[in-house]
Regions:
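N-terminal nucleotide-binding beta1-loop-alpha1 segment
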Residues: 1-17
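Short beta-strand/turn micro-motifs composed of small residues
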Residues: 9, 50-52, 102
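Short glycine-rich anion-binding loops that position phosphate/pyrophosphate groups of nucleotides
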Residues: 11-13, 103-106
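Short, well-formed alpha-helical segments that are part of the catalytic scaffolds
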Residues: 16-39
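Conserved N-terminal catalytic core of the sugar/cofactor nucleotidyltransferase
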Residues: 31-96
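Acidic metal-phosphate-binding loop of nucleotide-sugar-dependent transferases
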Residues: 76-77, 105-107
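Conserved donor-nucleotide/metal-binding helix-loop-beta segment in metal-dependent transferases, i.e.
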Residues: 85-87, 93, 106-122
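Short aromatic-hydrophobic micro-motifs that form the base-stacking/packing surface
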Residues: 97-101
Length: 122
């Protein structure tokens, strides 16, 4: 049983735009989160899911640098309809199971995610 971690990435927040690109000790919040998520042994792959309205070059660079996948939702309502973006991303990558993560908090409990996956597999 495989699990993909999908990070739903947006930069158009009204309160704090581009917050996932803010840096902490030289790394963006998004890169810190990716680094932490890579420690989850139960995960098959990590996928950044963005809309085509985002800054594609920045996300392509981050995906390549951090060796994660990138899904770009094309010409649809997925910028505001996050569920559609998750659905289309999981279909594109033929995901068996997904773990949804929002990337604006780099300090998630990866051990809890690992335990949830193990519990689900039982």
């Amino acid at each position: 049983m495989k699990f993909d971690i999908i990070l739903q990435c947006r930069t158009r927040s009204r309160r704090l735009p581009n917050k996932i690109f803010y840096k902490i000790r030289g790394n963006t919040i998004l890169e810190i989160l990716i680094s932490n998520l890579k420690k989850i042994r139960q995960a098959n792959r990590i996928i950044l899911a963005i809309s085509s309205n985002e800054n594609l070059e920045i996300f392509k660079k981050i995906a390549k640098k951090n060796e994660v996948n990138l899904f770009i939702a094309q010409n649809d309502l997925s910028e505001n309809n996050v569920l559609t973006r998750f659905y289309r991303c999981s279909k594109e990558y033929n995901s068996e199971n997904i773990v949804r993560i929002t990337p604006d908090c780099p300090f998630i409990n990866i051990h809890m995610i690992e335990q949830m996956i193990i519990y689900y597999k039982k």
